[in-house]
């Protein structure tokens, strides 16, 4: 088996990645496959932190457009990430993987409150740590959370799992001739106005020198290939 090139990673999974074909909620089969792929990394000795989005359940920005107060909508979105985190923790437990779910705000009896030193301790013990509830503040995306937590836990890389094979020069769903980039600099992403993640999240990663790799989590084995250094997806650094 190939050796990992990263010791510690922050894996960002969108809420949409958990959806089934009906486009709603959580597909247990997809969740279980992700848990098995994460287990592979743990067995290779990789320390894994996970940030989940909540877009499969709620999106604060969309609720705000419908007339709801944005702060209230974002709070609902944060709770959606906790629900996804509970589902992921359960799948990992059933795959015999030790996992800890942490929330940015107190949810006594459901999960632990985020604590930086405790998270580091758990990672060193090879427990998967799931970070939920975003940053705990409205107006910040879960991409921002992923970059923030990745920097805090001193991850080697933020792995952004998507439904496409990496970063393209245009939308591959609309243009079959879209070009896939293998390597990009932070400056190139900004200059070309490529849609990697929101600007706040991206500039946070850039300012702290946090590499980002974008790949297709829908491809079985892609996560392992990224971690073992194969040319999978797009690398930004």
Curated annotation (Swiss-Prot):
Its EC number is 2.7.4.22. Residues 20-25 are annotated as: Involved in allosteric activation by GTP. It holds the Pfam family AA_kinase. It is an enzyme of class 2 (transferase). Transmembrane segments: none annotated. It catalyses: UMP + ATP = UDP + ADP. UMP binds at residues 54, 74, 135-142. One of its GO terms (molecular function) is UMP kinase activity. It is found in: Cytoplasm. Keywords: Allosteric enzyme, ATP-binding, Cytoplasm, Kinase, Nucleotide-binding, Pyrimidine biosynthesis, Transferase. Allosterically activated by GTP. Inhibited by UTP. The keyword Transferase applies. GO terms for cellular component: cytosol. ATP binds at residues 12-15, 55, 59, 162, 168, 171. Gene3D superfamilies: Acetylglutamate kinase-like (3.40.1160.10). Signal peptide: none annotated. The keyword Cytoplasm applies. Pathway: Pyrimidine metabolism; CTP biosynthesis via de novo pathway; UDP from UMP (UMPK route): step 1/1. It comes from the Bacteria. Coiled coil: none annotated. Belongs to the UMP kinase family. NCBIfam families: pyrH_bact. Catalyzes the reversible phosphorylation of UMP to UDP. This is Uridylate kinase.
């Amino acid at each position: 088996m190939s050796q990992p090139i990263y010791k510690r990673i922050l894996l960002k999974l969108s809420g949409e990645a958990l959806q089934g074909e009906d486009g709603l909620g959580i597909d247990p089969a997809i969740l279980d496959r992700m848990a098995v792929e994460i287990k592979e990394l743990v067995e290779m000795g990789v320390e894994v932190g996970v940030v989940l989005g909540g877009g499969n359940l709620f999106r604060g920005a969309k609720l705000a457009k419908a007339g709801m107060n944005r702060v209230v909508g974002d709070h609902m979105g944060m709770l959606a990430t906790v629900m996804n985190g509970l589902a992921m923790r359960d799948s990992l437990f059933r795959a015999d993987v030790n996992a800890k779910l942490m929330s940015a705000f107190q949810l006594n009896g459901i999960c632990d409150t985020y604590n930086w030193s405790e998270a580091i301790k758990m990672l060193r013990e090879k427990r998967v740590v799931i970070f939920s509830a975003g940053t705990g503040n409205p107006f910040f995306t879960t991409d921002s959370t992923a970059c923030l937590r990745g920097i805090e836990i001193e991850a080697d890389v933020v792995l952004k799992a998507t439904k496409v094979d990496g970063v393209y020069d245009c939308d591959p769903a609309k243009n079959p001739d879209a070009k896939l980039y293998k390597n990009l600099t932070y400056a190139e992403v900004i200059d070309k106005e490529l849609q990697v993640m929101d600007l706040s999240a991206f500039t946070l990663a850039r300012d702290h020198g946090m590499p980002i790799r974008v790949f297709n989590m829908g491809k079985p084995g892609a996560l392992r290939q990224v971690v073992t250094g194969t040319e999978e997806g797009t690398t930004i650094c």
